A protein has these predicted regions:
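Long, domain-scale functional regions
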Residues: 1-287
């Protein structure tokens, strides 16, 4: 079944789609998207879903724009960032300053420049938060800097023991991790373009969990990247970020330099611009 549920985000009450939803299709910029949620400010968050409409449960590489590493390097805590700071840093703040673009951010920005920038579709996009939650797990003493072993919040999922991370959050815990273009009240203002990735919180709320699930609308039959850091392991100096496994399981993670991770960009449409359609695959919402 499909559901519309409610949770708080940085802007108010957000209504998110969960499960086998069949009325959240959008056609925009000649591509198909799925509505993930109505943000607290009324804007509409959508995720890329292909050049044609795909049914829930359908496995297709068309449901992503391509494949990319999250970061081409992996040997420092900094590389769990959608943007990152200094490698070899002695402080958390220096490692996680939003100075350098990640590999996946550059990939997504290039897609935006090729498909959205300079077109009439730009005017329909809104600025809203994309969360790259680099907060440290409450069971961990790691510093998040250099090559120190560090468990980030999503090292523990709600399916694991200890109740370290039993609440999904649509409010990004740290403003430095709340990626926006111009909103510096709620976000960091670090983005050039209003496009990003889904967090693991959003994926779990949509129906991803710790077991295979091909029935919810985010299933693609491919491994694809989330924006949520997992951990940095000092043996081998390896940075890991969460993703969604090919069976739909949101428990997936990969070394950040894994170059075969699928990329599914996300952006936010301005409130009330989807004036046509009923949201079905055959009659998607449209401008």
């Amino acid at each position: 079944n499909g559901y519309l549920c409610k949770a708080k985000d940085a802007y108010g009450d957000s209504y998110y789609y969960r499960g086998n939803v069949t009325n959240n299709y959008v056609k925009f910029a000649d591509k198909y998207w799925r509505i993930v949620r109505i943000n607290g400010d009324g804007t509409v968050r959508v995720i890329y879903d292909g050049t044609s409409a795909h049914a829930n449960g359908e496995s297709s590489s068309d449901r992503q724009i391509g494949k990319s590493a999250f970061n081409s390097s992996y040997n420092d805590n900094a590389y769990v960032g959608y943007m990152y700071g200094a490698t070899g840093a002695s402080t958390y703040a220096a490692a996680h300053a939003n100075t350098n673009d990640s590999t996946i951010k550059a990939y997504i920005d290039n897609w935006y420049k090729a498909n959205i920038l300079g077109t009439a579709n730009e005017e329909y996009l809104a600025d809203n938060i994309f969360c790259n939650d680099r907060s440290i797990s409450n069971d961990n003493t790691g510093t998040g800097a250099g090559t120190t072993r560090t468990n980030y919040r999503w090292y523990w999922g709600p399916w694991e023991s200890g109740n370290h991370n039993d609440n999904m959050k649509l409010i990004c815990p740290q403003q430095n991790d709340a990626f926006t273009v111009s909103d510096t009240t709620n976000g960091n203002g670090a983005l050039t373009y209003p496009i990003g990735l889904l967090s693991t919180d959003e994926i779990v709320l949509a129906g991803g969990w710790s077991k295979e699930n091909s029935g919810y609308y985010l299933y693609s039959g491919q491994y694809w990247w989330a924006s949520s850091p997992d951990y940095f392991y000092f043996v081998g100096y390896n940075a890991f970020v969460r993703g969604v496994d090919s069976d739909g399981d949101a428990h997936g993670h990969s070394l950040v330099n894994y170059s075969s991770g699928g990329v599914r960009p996300v952006f936010n449409l301005k409130a009330e611009v989807l004036a046509q359609g009923t949201g079905t695959a055959s009659d998607p919402y449209r401008i």
